[in-house]
Amino acid sequence: MVVGSGLIAKAFHSFVDDENIIIFASGVSNSLETDEKCFVREKNLINATTKANPSKKLIYFSTCSIDDQSVNSRPYVQHKKSIEDFIAVISNNYIIFRLSNLVGKGGNKNTIFNYLVSSIKENKTVNIWKNASRNLLDVTDLYLAVREVLKEDAIANEVVNLANTRSFLIPEIVIE
């Protein structure tokens, strides 16, 4: 079962008919979001989905920013941590994957990668800090990693950080 229709949901399409797993890919995706209604909607959907499918393993995608002191007080990051805690209470069979900056064709226009691509295509001026960096994770790599974890079936009720082995300077991303 796949809940959602965005970049992650599309990548996990092969799980649509899976009767044992919920890929929850329908959450707040804009890391600059501050609207409480969006946060409540996600929590309510997780609650309803989990209650309607109590025997299925819940796969939830959170953010590595929870461990980043420079941003972990932002509403989005606080919300993701709150959802992680909520899942631990309402589900007895879950894995939470904390992701770095996800990239892939299509997806959220608010991600750093998609912002840079659209700005370049539209010939817009972009201010870039030469020492700023981002850890980019391709959605295909996310899918392959999660699929392997699920195939091994050795992890339950845990939080797993998924990120690239290195971060990239923003100028590197733009030039490449």
Question: Where would I find each of the regions flagged by the language model?
Answer:
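N-terminal Rossmann NAD(P)H-binding glycine-rich loop of SDR-like oxidoreductase domains
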Residues: 1-17
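Catalytic phosphate/metal-binding cores of nucleic-acid and nucleotide-processing enzymes, i.e., regions
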Residues: 13-15, 19, 94, 138
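Catalytic helix-loop patch of NAD(P)-dependent Rossmann-fold dehydrogenases
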Residues: 39-48, 64-104, 108
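Active-site beta-alpha turn of Rossmann-fold NAD(P)-dependent dehydrogenases/reductases
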Residues: 26, 59-63, 98-100, 163
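Mid/C-terminal beta-alpha module of Rossmann-like enzyme folds, strongest
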Residues: 152-176
